[in-house]
Amino acid sequence: MIKYLSIIYFLFSSISFSDTTIVALDQVHHSFGGLGNNRTSTNEIQFPNGSTDYSSITMRVNLECPTGGCDPWDRKAKISVYHIDQWIEIGRYVTPYGVECGWEIDVTDYRSILRGEVILKSFIDTWVQPGWLVSVEFDFVEGQGQYPFTVVRNLWNYDRLVYGDPTIPVDISTIQEYLPNDTEEAYIRITTTGHGQGNTENAAEFSDKRHDILINGEVSHVHNFWRPDCEFNDCSPQNGTWQYDRAGFCPGDKVDAQNLSILDFSLPGNTVEFDYVLEDYFNQCSPNNPSCVNGVTCTSCAYNNTGHTEPFYYIGSQLIIHTTNKHSNADVYLSISEQDTSLSSVDIYLENYVSVYGVSFKLDLSQLEIQGDGNLSFEDGISGRAEESNWTVSINGEGLIVALAQGSGEPIQPGEGILTRIQLNLENISILSGSLKIIDVEASGYFGRQLSFETGEPTTFELLNTNEELIIPTKIMLHNAYPNPFNPYTTISYDMSEDNFVNLTIFDLAGKKIKTLLNESMVAGFRSVRWRGLDEQYQPVSTGVYLCVFQAGNFRETKKIILLK
């Protein structure tokens, strides 16, 4: 055992990653006026491909004054990343009154979206010509973080949620999300700032309001985002009223996101319902209030661009899930599960954070080599989560799979596991080899809403030979797994000199059963089965040494295999 653990240590220690700094923006001018609308700057950035190999990621934002001076006003601003068809806010700040400043923001929670080619957007809500020169850098610090795998899911995101006006009712949607079985930590990461002044209670910039966050219908957190410390701002002195405390921000400072725990109220493997309920408030100083009287109810009932502006909240939030193993950030994740070439079938794995009402995709056959007189064909899908939900799974000769609820069928609820099994018809096919992958995915949610998706890596048929004139092995044998150590999968080959009942099971070193790969009658021949490092619930297992126990009749043999992540 010490020998194998030494191999693991050597492989880990031989992989070296160094600290890395990525310059995303370098003095990019944000302004509005004669130079045009340059309040937003969008750039494509190349981040490290393996962001899980860094213990922390820090975003540094620096503001400088262009020729003519800085914007004299405090402006809300944010940095966002485009990921799987949506923008995700990773940091917010408010500019100072007319002076230069800079901040560091911990963005380690966004490691899963800060990798490879990334589209980054910088926005400042400036309306004047001078504006700002914006520089943004990311510092990646090498090492293993506490949570190397993180899921990021958008929750409530509103650029302008009007507050206290019954003619513009607040409509914050209820959101349901799934927590994977291997969740180690989960929380709501929320950033709320209030804006507008000259209203009842001077809302929403200068009014201290507490909003409720509900988990599964019960108040889990009272959201207190008031900033009582603006006079201690490091970015000082400034011009203007920077010392006054505000709702969620201070001029010339970053806006710290708040992390609100979830696992105290819901367990992994369950669907969680989230609500955000604002404290009751009525703005009597609104032009939409028929009872408002100038100089009586308020100084002025009309909004203007100076002392009386509409109260609203600027809300950004995500569900952050730290897991033992890697998961997708998309609504739907489809992959071809571990492939046993002796079964002549393909298992389709589905992980979905939201309810799925329909899905279609195609098995790409272009990379398969087929030899023989027959044609590869498929049978409609059976078993799995689709069948449990009374769905039908149909497939045509080109590999197009359509899975739909029929009649009394229900949507597939959030969760993870095998969606369906597709049987391959291999009559008169002697050799089938190559790779198979999922393409052309379309997934729909409630009322036909298009769902985001990602797909897994292609699965490879090492060799599937159905020729009846095969050479029969002379003895039963279990071969060493290859590759070993492995990640993400290994192939376990075995020889059958006669027809027999076969059991092949993976155990950990404590003797706990991890996964039964085979437990059925097999005919004589050279065979193999693949293990992708998943347990019986199709959940990824951790790095370590495992035992592969093979039994065919009275023959029994054990091999060690090593999973590295």
Positions of the model-derived regions?
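Short strand-edge motifs at loop-to-beta-strand transitions and within beta-strands
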Residues: 173-175, 418-422, 525-529
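Hydrophobic h-region of N-terminal signal peptides that target proteins for export
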Residues: 7-18
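Beta-strand signatures of extracellular beta-sandwich domains
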Residues: 78-80, 212-214, 360-362, 503-507
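Glycine-centered coil/turn sites that cap beta-strands in beta-rich domains
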Residues: 342-351, 355, 465-482, 486-507, ...
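Extracellular/secretory-pathway and virion-surface proteins
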Residues: 19-328
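Short proline/glycine-enriched turn/loop motifs at strand-loop junctions of beta-rich domains
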Residues: 183, 192-194, 206, 353-356, ...
